[in-house]
Amino acid sequence: MFTKKSHADVKKSTAKLQDSKKDSASRLRHLRMILDNVELEESKCLFETNYSHVYFILYDTFIQAEANLKQKVHKAHREELDGSLWLLEKILCLLPELLARRWQCHSLSRIMAKLLHLGNSPKLRREGVRYFLLWYQTLGENAPGYVHAMYADLIPGLIVPQKGVVGPDTEFSASDFLTHPNMKADGGMASVFHDNAFSHPVQSSEVVALLPPSSSEKSAPPDPRDGLEVLLNSMVHTAACLRWRDNRAQKDHRAFAFLLQRFMDVFLPVFSPNFDVSCSIYNPRLDLPVMRSINKKEEVMASCVVVLINWVSRFTHERLLSHRLDCTLHIEDVDQVRLHGYQQGLIVRDVLYVNRENINFVHEVYRQAFLLNFTSKPQIEAIRTAIAVYRDWMTGETPPPFLLEPNDDPPPPSNAGGTPRSQRLRTPSYVGAIAGSKDQLVVRAGRQNVLQVFVTNAANVFLVNTANLNICFPTRSRSYRSTPLEEQTEICKKVLNVYRTMVMNTEMDTRTWEQLLMVLLQVTSIVLHQNQHTLPSGTNKSATLGGILGSAIFQTLIVTWIRAHTKVPVNVLLWEKFLNVLQSLTHREELIIEWNKTIQTLTRVFSRYTYGINLLDLPLDRVAESRAEKRRRIGSVWQGSGSNSAANGGSAASAAISQNRQRESLAESSSSRSEETSSQVPLPNHPRPHHQHTQSQGGTGHGTRPIPLTPMLSRSYSEGSLASAARSSRIRRRRAATPKPKALQPSQLAENRINPQDLRRAMSLDSLARKGDAEETDSYQEGDNESGAGSRSPSPTASSGIEGGSIKDAQLQIDASLDDANSGSYGSGSNSGSISGRRCIILGGSAEGWHPDSTSIMWKRMLGALGDVNRIPKADLHAQVFMHLLEMTQNLIKIKQNQGISTDNQNTQPMPPLVPPIGIVAPWCYGSLSLDRSFKKGKLWALQLLCSLAIQGAVNMQQLPLFYHALHQLLTGEDRDLIYAILKHLEGPRLLSLLLPGHTLLLLDLVHASAILLTSLEVSRSTPRAEVAALLGSLLCYPSSLLTRSVLQPTPQKFELMECSDLQDHILNIVLRCARREPSAKARCIALSQLGQWLLMRLSQPLPASNSGRANLFQQAVPHHKDVHPKASSVYNPRIKEVLQVLLQALQFKHHTIAIVAVDSLKLCAERGRQLAAIERVPQLIITAICKALEIQSVTKPKDSDKVVLTSLMLCLGEFCMAIPAPIMLTPFNEQGDTLVLQVLRVLLQVASGAPRHERVKLTADDDFDMHIAHDDLQGDGRLPEATYQTSETIQKCITAIKLCAKAVSMHLVTHIGHFPMGIGASRLSSMVEEQDDIGNAAYGGQVETRRDSVELPSVVSAQNMQLFMLNSGLVASFIELPTLKLPGGGITAGLVTADKQVRVLMRDLNGKACWDASILYSEPRNAEEPPKTTPKIQHSQPLDSMATSMVTHTPSPRHTLRHRPAGVLPLAKDMAPDLDQLDDMLAYIGHTSPECVAPTVSQLNAPTASPLSGNQEAQAISVILNQRLLEQEFVTHSTQAPSPALRHASSNSSLQQPDQRSLHSTTASFDSLPTRTEMPFQYCRLLFSHLGLAGWERRSRTHLLQRSEKLMRELRNVDLQKCRETHKMAVIYVAAGQEDKGSILRNTSGSSTYEMFVSALGWEIDLETHNGFLGGLPRQGCGATAPYYATPFLEVVYHVATRMPSDSSEAMLLKTRHLGNDEVHIVWSEHNRDYRRDILPTEFCDVLIVVYPLRNGLFRVTVNRKPEVPWFGPLANESVVSGACLATLIRATAINASRTKRAALPLYQQFYEERNRSLDSVSSRYKESTTFEDFASRIYNPMPLSTLGTLRESNASSSAAPLASALLDHNRASVKGWVQASIDSGPIMGIAPSASAGSTAAMEAATGMSSASPRGPRKLGAPFKSVTKKHSLQHIAVGGGAGAGGDTPPESPTLPQRRFK
């Protein structure tokens, strides 16, 4: 039995304990020793056996200690008291059964009274409370009344009123004493022991304090809070301390339940009079909380309430209990004290949860927490605690029993303690006492009831005004003290966070949702209204709770509202309350901000679920094909498969979906976090004005589920919810008829309509137009249809938001992951049979989440949540609302624009049946325009919105009267800001292209408003000066037939029509003024461009009544030959000259962009040169003004922009000089005889020479022309490129380029003026003849044809009949002597007697290459038999091609005379004869008639002077000459008689003898009387060279030979490849109706008739195979047969027309795509109903996109879209309306200017003449041969000496690899004598062994026969040259011929044909 000590010791001590003789102290000591050595059960047996002894020991020791302490407080005496109290505790714990029967009740009460005396020390009194509670719970209900009274006095300072109601036998009455047997004596009234004189014979001594407090302990007055805390803690500490014999667990619970009940009955009503004992969570009273005030009396006891709250939370807060258990279990060697303490906590909690009353008590305690008033820090912490408890109840893993549903199965017993581990710490009986109770099912209230109670009670934290409390609370930071308002704000944030947790993560039923909504409405209404009215107007927002939390409250309310409607059907009356609350708070900016966020978010959801478009990932934003391909590979968000994918659960698909979700969530909000374990959504600490409701695709528990993101609404699940087109149009008409949009408020509609179908229709989005009629079903109930809808998804975020007390930036997110399985893909489930089961909740179905119907209805409901927005009282908020409405409308427009966009760009998708309701807010806009001036900002936003609707075509016929009326009133009103807003947002000419019915009525209003704007001095970026200029310009060029004369009278009060026939004249005046004085650069440019268009139209259609039929829709501008004069009308608009003057004045602008635009506008008229010439003095005016502008624009230190302006001016000048008829250009215009050509050349010479101007040129602009630009809006966009700094090098480059341009233009004019185009057309200005065409087989009449691109050049290099000269640095000339060409019919020289050879001169310069043929003319045919006359006859030989002209030479007549006139006869021309010497006779006549002229030493003037030679020498010289003459005559005679004539040519030391196989050629009309002569191979070239004056000494410094080599010939070929004109290539693309993808557009092979007419008017068709001009990279075969081509004297344009190119194969499509994609300018003709986009044909180029849209009225809308780096250009600006007469011309000019401007913006770009000049300079610098005059003259006589030729042949014949050029370089310095000297030196040899000329073509090819052909067979000429049969009456010539195959023929060069040499 005894375990700790031996039996002897325990028994001995027991005996001593029972010995009454021993003193009580010894007995107590032995008792303590016994208890220390036995178990508890043994101790209980011991006490029960010896209870009398034990109590005696207690009483005796207590009395002794009391007596000792009264005498003196000593340590020993305190120890005696402690021992006595120890025994008291043991008695109370071990003898509960005895005590329960009131054993020693009176004695114990005396002891307890002494212990509980208020004079005792606090420690002793705390112990006394504990002992009393042990005793009190033992007695229970059996306690007498005075014990209950003692309990009521446990809390000092808390006065408990005695109710006087006591139980039976609770106190002794006087009758009990009197009837007691001991009281009876003699007489029945005498007592044996006591004096019975008194009614109470025993007087109780006065109870005094046992142990007064020490001096160190405070003696402050008692605080009820401390007493209450002691009492509550003691209640816990006394639990489970009594050792009952049986049923201990139940009795422990019952004992504590008794204490708790007594506490609730006695103390609770005292310190918490507002404690509602009737509060019940089982039948909750959900009265909405109201505003309360702070009562100071209540605040006194608030600290006690805080103590109670904290005490209850210790045992109901799951997190704290779990934490205590964990701490207990993790400590090694768990002591019994800790374990007992934990068990006590469990008992307390179990008692609190044991029945409904206690559970209601707990919730009422927490309700009292929410009713605290933030007046102390403990109160604030108590509120935090209450919030945390409820939060943990809702989110904890083990809910308390009252949260369980009554119908659910009971929880397992292990869960009773809160955690499974608590099972180990309990005995089976203990657990069974708790879990086995039948009351467990009774206490279950269900989660919904608790949520409703919490929602209602927690709202009280908002409903107290703490702003006026002057209190500060200490914080952790010493420097900062918080205020009650700040603390209340943090608490409210926590409550809102819990509300949001419920909204997002908690399942709630209809009643809970409605309660939450009502509470939020109540909070919103009271808090925001109360703070608004109780504070002065100037108070800062942060000084009120509503000001701080307004945004968060509104957001929570709105989000809860939307979320509720997708979860449960909500009563429609709540919608009324919601509307009323929001409409009453429209004066708060926070509401407007949150409403905007909600609308924008709902618009995104609306877009996704109704139209299948993600606004954050629009199809149009995915421009690059590679990105789209990458999306398709990864797996697009839009490929979700719905419920089928969810059923399959593929891991790869779910992973892809989750990746896409994360990407999209990050795209919407960078602050969105996603954690699976999150439990709530914190609110933002400081609401950001720009934060958005993020759109998350994931929620807790739905992370891996494939979600249907694009339900394609092929069929409506609500059947009739989406109104049909007819019904929606009726509703739109009804709404448009009233300015105030009542239709936006479904509640108002519900009041006026009875039919439930109409009501449901109004609730749904009536603006959704659906093709066809939707089915109508009658299965809906009216109540269901009245409920709203909406949804928000869980937003998992970190739980630290609530713990930290801050509202973080984690918004309630829009639901994209639906919570149930029946919300699958609509596209796949549309054919399912049970459609009604898939209906959304708002329509009476059961499907939760977003559906097309629910999103549409909720979007529209929230749109109208503010009521009539025009009733918003504050103007700035009114403006803010309309700004947000505009943003929403722009998103709707984006949806519309992105519908039907092909993702693969290979086919065009059909337009979907649903169209976004873009114009849904139009009635509000019309209503806002009628407000007063204070709402001006809102009216501006409304106007912008209306204009956007008009541009998008959303203004229907019913709204047009309202729209026109509003525009008319505002345009003619006085408010300029509104006028400017209309003019800006109508986008100028865009209004005209809309073709709104009756829009011409507003023309006069628009012109009137435009005039007001343009005449004002307001210049800013917001002033639409450019748009107005474009609008007026388009109206200026409008066909008069389309302008109605009836327009609205421009007065604001009237709406009447008037006649205005001179509208365009009025517009012209305004545009002229704009061009003269406009301060904005962009508007000035547009005005000048429009004037140029007007000029073009008036010159193209001189008569106003010109035919406007389709036959004259386009005019093709084909350049005519100079002899062809087209018919021109002689009647022109009289204001043409005035307009021209303005354009010409603008040329002098120092603003370079404006000057270039003026030049471009003027160039438009260059094509109409003949029409301009018909107007008096206009050509002279134009030429003079351009020349003057050149002088003005010329500066000494030009920049790149100056260079661009000057070159544009010079090229424009050249164009006009070529366009104006040559007779006008050559006619003198002043007395000095100056012509326009002379004036032009003078200016160009001045520019080219860089001569400085000695006097300043005065501006020719008149006084009305303003050269100043006040607002340069082209600074950042459209400005010409300029270097940031200038250096001498850059300046010199610009000067060189300007001079070169002037030189090129002047040379061009000299060559081509009056000659363009020639017979061949405009395609070529340069000759196609090359040197190799005349070398080789030219001697055979050109019978063999070779390739032009052949690289066999040695025959040219070594040709004896050709020489290359550099006449100056920019002019290379080739002289070639060749036999006279046989032309059909004799050509131009038919019948004339010419030499048998002719000279061909090829000249290359900046202007191109020219070919001149020169031939000697002997006589006319009629004088063939007579001796030839001495007068030369000029004749032209037929050129090789039509671009070559003939050069004329003449032969000198022989000068040998045999007779003389008499000295006195005057020689006259009429009696001149061949045998008379005119000069000799004249000298004789002068000497005879005027002897004074004869010198004294001279006999006569015609007498020769004395010979300087002696007589012998003179005779010898005469003899030599005569011998030479004789030899020549013999040689001639011998050569004419020889059957095989041969020529002999000898070098200085050797001779080459080769037979001459060339038959001598002579003309058909040769001289028979004269012997046939054989000239030297270069004789005629030498004669021409000499006759041209090139052989003179004075030209020696500029004329040089060129070193002939293969490299030189390739360089010359490279020069020939350089263009002589500016070249452009452009793409022309046709888009048919319904085409919006790359594939279908490129497959078009033809277009409409109007398109074909347009293409034909862009230029003229050329045959690609035979075209000799610019091809723009097009191959001659493979890209179609023809292409449009356009050319002027200075430029060439080729159009890559997509419909001309084949598309029958993938290779052809690839080739077409390459050609089109590489063009920098795209011209698109679109007949599709939507605008063309750049990304349809994706390319890195396409810097400028010009799109033409044909309009219904015969006009054309043109848009010009340029990349940002492209500067501004004209004449067409973006958005223009153009007539067909000038469309092609304007498009062509705009495209050319665009291409030119783009190139000018490129760094290091060079013009065509710069590139050609560089090539010519390369030839001059590399191959110029420096020779002495002797060598130079020798090479003219003999181009290739034999020494050089022999070396060439040896090098060619040898096996060495030395190139030909090295041989030329090595031997060109050989000592070679002239031709004549060589002949004299080798005279004898010449006579003996004549040989053929080594330099002749025959000698070169002696080894081959006449019929030998080139080793390469003849083939068709390749690009870029072709030999074709000319279509005109020229001869067919086959030129060229390869060298023979013999050993003397130079080898082929291995160089490729197209390679360039440097």
Curated annotation (Swiss-Prot):
Residues 640-656 have a biased composition (Low complexity). PROSITE patterns: RAPGAP (PS50085). GO terms for cellular component: cytoplasm; nucleus. The modification Phosphothreonine is found at residue 1945. Keywords: GTPase activation, Phosphoprotein. One of its GO terms (biological process) is regulation of small GTPase mediated signal transduction. Residues 775-785 have a biased composition (Acidic residues). Residues 788-800, 1546-1568 have a biased composition (Polar residues). InterPro entries: ARM-type_fold (IPR016024), Rap/Ran-GAP_sf (IPR035974), Rap/Ran_GAP_dom (IPR000331), RGPA/RALGAPB_N (IPR046859), Tuberin/Ral-act_asu (IPR027107). The modification Phosphoserine is found at residues 718, 764, 767, 787, 791, 793, 795, 1551, 1949. Residues 758-774 have a biased composition (Basic and acidic residues). Residues 1612-1819 form the Rap-GAP domain. GO terms for molecular function: GTPase activator activity. The modification Phosphotyrosine is found at residue 980. It holds the Pfam family RALGAPB_N. Residues 400-414 have a biased composition (Pro residues). Gene3D superfamilies: Rap/Ran-GAP. Disulfide bonds: none annotated. Residues 1-21, 400-424, 635-804, 1534-1568, 1903-1958 are annotated as: Disordered. PANTHER family: RHO GTPASE-ACTIVATING PROTEIN CG5521-RELATED, TUBERIN. This is Probable Rho GTPase-activating protein CG5521. It comes from Drosophila melanogaster (Fruit fly).
